């Protein structure tokens, strides 16, 4: 546990007492939907809330969740499927916030786009995706509803990253691939691949990346996590109100073209960044995982691993500071509807 202590900085106007920032190691995936982290860092919100955030990029949700479990990260942003599967297997994670709603798509060669809009055409085909992909769960659930066995009627192949999935589709090693933003747009720009289905077509508003941490850390440093969420909530307001600068921040952090970031983030709205915990959506996702036999048999009560109270306290603090702000009022209503 970090011990907050007081240091003194000599300024021109005199001596001012300043508290040392709490260090937090934050893991993320290289996608614009994780951009609230970048805004909170670049606009100084983390610093203003007493958080010294170090950012670490991962290729897959499985790798990221493993790093959280190994106590190499204080916060992880690694989908919904991976954290829930880790919890089912015994990981003591707490979901305390969110980052992303939607954001995945199925990519194919142009000549195959029309037929794959009909799920029955996936029978006998090969579909590539990143290990423990959130889109995988929604896709399998949609297949099952369409009367297709998601384990027997097609072959789903896991790859070590999004680029590998795109390459597999391009080379014909798989018939289709499930990737997250910006990779479906990059695949179109570089190779002429197209989107046949957005995963949100199967389940609108599905939860994607949740904010997770080890439960003992959350309990020991509750106020640190509360202040962390205050910074993310403030970043959400900036993301809503300043699209042009947000695009520049995302593009700089991800080293991608601004036009591509703008298209996915604002023009086409292929995802939404949102720090809300979305407990109802997370429980729906858990039930989908159980329905498609994605989880091992478990007696885990998933409710014990979702803590919405820290976010509630963070949002209350922001509302106290800015009682008339329409975006924060909207976030309050959204929280009440979804938790």
Predicted regions and their residues:
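Short glycine-centered helix-capping/turn motifs at secondary-structure transition points
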Residues: 44, 71, 172, 269, ...
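Secondary-structure end/capping motifs
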Residues: 220-300
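Short, glycine-/small- and polar/acidic-enriched structural segments
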Residues: 22-160, 165, 175-181, 196-199, ...
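Pocket-lining segment of extracytoplasmic ligand-binding domains
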Residues: 81-82, 152, 163-254
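Short linear loop/turn motifs
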Residues: 54, 62, 155, 263-269, ...
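Bacterial N-terminal signal peptides that target proteins for export
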Residues: 1-7
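Conserved C-terminal helix/tail region of periplasmic/extracytoplasmic solute-binding proteins
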Residues: 291-339
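Hydrophobic h-region of N-terminal signal peptides that target proteins for export
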Residues: 9-20
